Design a protein with these regions (language model features):
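N-terminal acidic, glycine/proline-rich low-complexity segments
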Residues: 1-264
Length: 264
């Protein structure tokens, strides 16, 4: 039987670490990247999406890219890459995600920011979860989240989709070393404008990508998780589907993975 590469959908933004994550995904041969959407975790969705389109085009590729219509401007909005003869999908990100998922039949999602686009797809389409195999996501400090963001996280944790999660406190120690930064810019000079502002930002997207492709390199704690909205904490419960929360990874193997894609 012929091996079929998994279908991957990415929901992210365009900070320096996000841009690296996207570049890694575009250069990977382990999966089929079917589309991307821009969330609102750094730049506005519009600005992030335009940069994502530009980076994708810069690589000589054309992929489905959508933005969030419920958008807000951000002080971080900046044009780094410009799209040439390519445009956003003419629908909201959550609708585009649903269309791609239903077309593919089975899909994995990697989310390196807020969960709004994914949660809205869950709310608007009853059969959305039927098409999603796994979600790889970051669990941020819940004290910093709005009630709406907490509700989005709780919905995903209760959806029945298999969730693999990395806690923000775990991810914060994974940063780009200066020698690797220099090597990446040397090998990919088009990334210099973005990476010159890199300042020890955790490599969240890259970690999630590695998690999606090499889960055997990680050790997990398995538990059903529920948001306590009053205390803004996660509670372990038996009534929820088990999520897989990362508590250990071979750091050297992660950096080897990153360097193999970006530095070699």
């Amino acid at each position: 039987m012929e091996y079929q590469k998994p279908f991957i959908y990415i929901d992210t933004n365009f900070s320096p670490a996000d841009g690296l994550f996207i570049k890694m995904a575009l250069d990977s041969f382990d999966f089929e990247l079917v589309g991307l959407s821009a969330n609102r975790s750094f730049m506005s969705s519009r600005a992030a999406g335009e940069n994502i389109l530009g980076l994708v085009n810069n690589e000589g590729l054309y992929l489905s890219v959508a933005k969030n219509y419920d958008d807000l401007e951000s002080k971080y909005d900046n044009e780094i890459f410009t799209a040439e003869d390519d445009y956003f999908e003419d629908m909201d990100a959550f609708e585009n995600l649903y269309d791609l998922a239903s077309d593919c039949g089975r899909l994995d999602i990697i989310v390196s920011g807020d969960l709004y686009n994914i949660a809205k797809a869950c709310r608007e389409f009853e059969d959305f979860t039927d098409y999603i195999d796994h979600i790889f996501l970051l669990i941020p400090d819940l004290k910093d989240l709005s009630k709406e963001d907490l509700a989005d996280l709780d919905l995903i944790l209760s959806s029945g989709i298999e969730v693999f999660a990395i806690d923000q406190n775990f991810a914060k120690n994974f940063i780009l070393e200066d020698k690797d930064l220099k090597n990446i810019i040397k090998n990919h000079p088009q990334m210099e404008k973005l990476l010159k502002s890199y300042d020890e930002e955790p490599l969240i997207g890259a970690l999630l990508l590695y998690l999606s492709q090499r889960p055997e390199a990680f050790i997990f704690e398995e538990a059903g998780l529920k948001v306590n909205f009053d205390e803004k904490i996660l509670e372990k419960v038996n009534s929820r589907p088990k999520a897989y929360l990362v508590n250990k990874v071979n750091e050297e193997s992660f950096y080897d993975y990153l360097r193999a894609i970006l530095c070699d």
